[in-house]
């Protein structure tokens, strides 16, 4: 259950010093380069589960979707598709639990105004590890900076451990 609840909070890590542009939507900083996306997502996620998500809403385009993929013990793939508002409601139900996401490693591919980020992450709730996994993030460059168009997440499981090349 925790894996499903928190796997959306994937990505990020500290990329201090990344130049930021101002978002027209909520006054939140949008990354000026794709390498700033993980830190922007991390900053928007980290904190109390019931915190204001205005910066997360500014970072994702309104049509963005989040897909959470999991493998059953029998190896069967299942997925859940959510809007950002769906995710916010689900996470908010955790109350004041402190969420902290840390990026382990990431790789970026970019062509013009589109980018794809492949990111491994570790998620903690109230200081305790609850999930690790991989994020696949798609982004687009707009006038104010880079925004996320979609996030696909698969949390680590007994049948799909995180490969060593994605660990620190």
Region spans (language model):
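Short, low-complexity N-terminal intrinsically disordered segments enriched in polar/charged residues
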Residues: 2, 21-59, 166-168
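Sec/Tat-exported extracytoplasmic proteins
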Residues: 41-49, 60-64, 68, 88-91, ...
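Bacterial N-terminal signal peptides that target proteins for export
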Residues: 1-9
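Surface-exposed, charged secondary-structure patches
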Residues: 22, 65-66, 78-129
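A mature extracytoplasmic/lumenal domain signature
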Residues: 60, 70, 119-121, 135, ...
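Short beta-strand edge/turn micro-motifs at domain boundaries
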Residues: 132-160
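Hydrophobic pocket/interface hotspot
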Residues: 56, 64, 117, 139
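Bacterial N-terminal signal peptides
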Residues: 8-16
């Amino acid at each position: 259950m925790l894996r499903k609840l928190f796997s959306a909070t994937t990505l990020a890590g500290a990329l201090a010093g990344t130049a930021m542009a101002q978002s027209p939507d909520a006054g939140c900083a949008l990354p000026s380069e794709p390498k700033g996306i993980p830190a922007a997502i991390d900053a928007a996620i980290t904190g109390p589960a019931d915190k204001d998500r205005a910066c997360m809403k500014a970072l994702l385009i309104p049509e963005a979707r989040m897909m959470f993929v999991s493998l059953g013990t029998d190896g069967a793939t299942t997925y859940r598709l959510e809007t950002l508002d769906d995710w916010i409601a689900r996470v908010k139900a955790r109350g004041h639990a402190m969420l902290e996401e840390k990026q382990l490693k990431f790789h970026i591919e970019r062509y013009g105004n589109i980018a794809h980020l492949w990111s491994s992450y570790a998620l903690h709730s109230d200081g305790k590890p609850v999930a690790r996994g991989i994020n696949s993030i798609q982004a687009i460059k707009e006038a104010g900076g880079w925004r996320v168009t979609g996030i696909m997440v698969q949390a680590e499981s007994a049948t799909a451990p995180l490969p060593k090349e994605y660990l620190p």
